[in-house]
Design a protein with these regions (language model features):
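Active-site machinery of serine-nucleophile hydrolases
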Residues: 76, 80-125
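Primarily recognizes the serine-hydrolase "nucleophile elbow" in alpha/beta-hydrolase
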Residues: 143-184
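Short beta-strand/loop motif that positions the catalytic acidic residue
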Residues: 192-194, 198
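Sec-dependent N-terminal signal peptides
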Residues: 30-39
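C-terminal catalytic histidine-bearing segment of alpha/beta-hydrolase fold enzymes
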Residues: 181, 199-200, 204-257
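Gly/Ser-rich "nucleophile elbow"/oxyanion-hole loop immediately N-terminal to the catalytic nucleophile
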Residues: 67-72, 121-150
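A domain-start/cap signature at the N-terminus of enzymes
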Residues: 2, 8-9, 22, 43-76, ...
Length: 257
């Protein structure tokens, strides 16, 4: 196993089981980064973006914030892309959305993952990406957020609908969802947005899931925005808005691991 001395392996395993004091949390982070480096997943001391392959059911981009944030149990932000970014070339995922904004200089105080699918989003496979992050980094599991656009908007609501107990909040842009998930989604703070002139995905797709949520609890955790005169592509600008990230990061959810 990368030529690790047996005593070092025992030591690292021991550290991972110790109480999460600030000292041990920091040592755990260093140990995990050491292991990741063994598999070719290496990072410098500052915020870094790295493609990850063969570690989950999807290949994905992994963004680690600066060390000072990483050592303080950062939240997790999952970005699910739309159909135009589908395929097996991860560079496509940089065309718009959260990863694009990071590359333009946006500082996001979270571990960010942006998986790529070639044929629609499977919430179980998305969960495998989240599981990788939870296993390898000392993140705040009470602050897991999901955001997606178009097909990624559907993926966001499908993931939150299947795993509502794991999602602190989610934003779905010009997508839709399964009305059977309405009552599960009603327990998650959601911001659903759709343009009134969207011809690629009609606004009725969002309206259906909004009604399903409202029928469960009146939509007490729901924020719905119908953007008058906006078409499908107009929603991309939300990734450039501070408001999106500020809204998401205000929420927490107690997760029973």
């Amino acid at each position: 196993m990368c030529g690790f001395p047996k005593k070092l392996l025992i030591s690292l395993h021991f550290l991972s089981k110790r109480s999460e004091s600030p000292i041990f949390a920091g040592m755990k982070t260093l140990s995990l980064l050491f292991f990741l480096g063994c598999f070719g997943i290496t990072f410098k001391s500052n915020a870094q973006l790295k493609p990850i392959y063969s570690q989950a059911d999807y290949a994905f981009w992994l963004h680690l914030p600066a060390d000072s944030i990483l050592k303080a149990k950062p939240p997790v932000l999952i970005f699910l892309h739309g159909k135009s970014l589908s395929g097996t070339d991860l560079t496509r995922v940089k065309r718009y959305g959260v990863i694009s904004e990071i590359e333009k200089g946006r500082k996001i105080p979270a571990v960010v993952v942006a998986p790529q699918t070639s044929n629609g989003w499977d919430p179980v496979k998305v969960m495998s990406v989240l599981s990788f992050v939870k296993k390898n980094f000392d993140v705040d599991t009470n602050r897991v957020y999901v955001v997606g656009m178009s097909m990624g908007g559907y993926g966001t609501l499908n993931f939150a609908g299947k795993y509502p107990e794991h999602v602190a909040a989610a934003v779905a842009l010009c997508g839709g969802g399964n009305i059977k998930d309405g009552c599960n989604l009603a327990t998650v703070p959601l911001w659903i947005q759709h343009g009134t002139l969207d011809q690629a995905v009609p606004i009725s797709e969002s309206e259906k899931i909004v009604r399903a949520i409202q029928n469960c609890n009146g939509g007490e955790n729901l924020k719905y925005t119908a953007l008058k005169g906006a078409d499908h592509g107009d929603l991309e600008k939300m990734f450039r808005a501070d408001e999106l990230y500020t809204w998401l990061f205000q929420f927490t959810k107690e997760v029973q691991e």
